[in-house]
């Protein structure tokens, strides 16, 4: 039996720097969560769609730490994200979706259905709801992404429906405020809990983690030297993966948070969203 099944995107990411340098690497929130959870000791399955352009060595790297029976390889291109860094520090991130459409209808292997916990990584909210309808009676957690900011604001009723049907939500501080419309992070946590989430886990970067289940608990970030931070983009996914590795195996909350913080610290020291090196 799997401890955790992660559903969402795996991508090909190209970083484009102001001096013209281009670096291509594997990405995708689902792979970030899944690889982190696997390295934290969980038995993990991944459900995603990739195209025939996805490098075989990347797929082999995934298969070395988790089950890839749920990875669909389809004619066409894998979702491709460009991270264009500008000299003023701003970043543009155009996305080509490729075969990564209609994720709410993606086949889930029968042997995955008895997994202890399912995690839905950021996909359009209507697709998240389709998956929740298919996973009725299962223990489900969910994550969000500011890419869907307009949909979140326009469809707050849809978000409430999603949150009401999951055990845990994993927004970062910015996402929590955006989703709820609150101006204070603790108010945002109360709102998300009021919508029905049993546990609200808000990552706050160097300020650590805020957890709310009717009462607040705050956990400091683990120390890391500024010069050790290579790429901050994968920290949230790595945290969620580590946390879920503990949660899916019945570990105490404090241990789940510690596992998440440890995995986040490690992924900050390397480029990319994955916790494994390819």
From Swiss-Prot:
Highest taxon in the source lineage: Archaea
UniProt entry keywords in alphabetical sequence: ATP-binding, Kinase, Magnesium, Nucleotide-binding, Transferase
Q: How does activity depend on pH?
A: High levels of activity within a broad pH range of 5.0-9.0.
Q: Does the keyword ATP-binding apply?
A: yes
Q: How does activity depend on temperature?
A: Optimum temperature is 90 degrees Celsius.
One of the GO BP terms on file: fructose metabolic process
Record's cofactor remark: Mg(2+) is the preferred cation, followed by Mn(2+) and Co(2+).
The EC number(s) given in the record are 2.7.1.213
Annotated catalysed reactions: cytidine + ATP = CMP + ADP + H(+)
- Which GO terms label this protein's molecular function in UniProt? ATP binding; cytidine kinase activity; fructokinase activity
Task: Name the residues that bind ATP.
Answer: 203-208
Q: Which cofactor does it need?
A: Mg(2+)
Q: Where is the active site?
A: 237 (proton acceptor)
Pfam families linked? PfkB
Q: What's this protein's family per the entry? A: Belongs to the carbohydrate kinase PfkB family.
Q: What does this protein do?
A: Involved in nucleoside degradation. Phosphorylates cytidine to CMP. Can also act on deoxycytidine and uridine, but is most active with cytidine. ATP is the most preferred phosphate donor, but it can also use GTP, CTP or UTP.
Identification of the protein by name:
Cytidine kinase
Q: Which organism is it from?
A: Thermococcus kodakarensis (strain ATCC BAA-918 / JCM 12380 / KOD1)
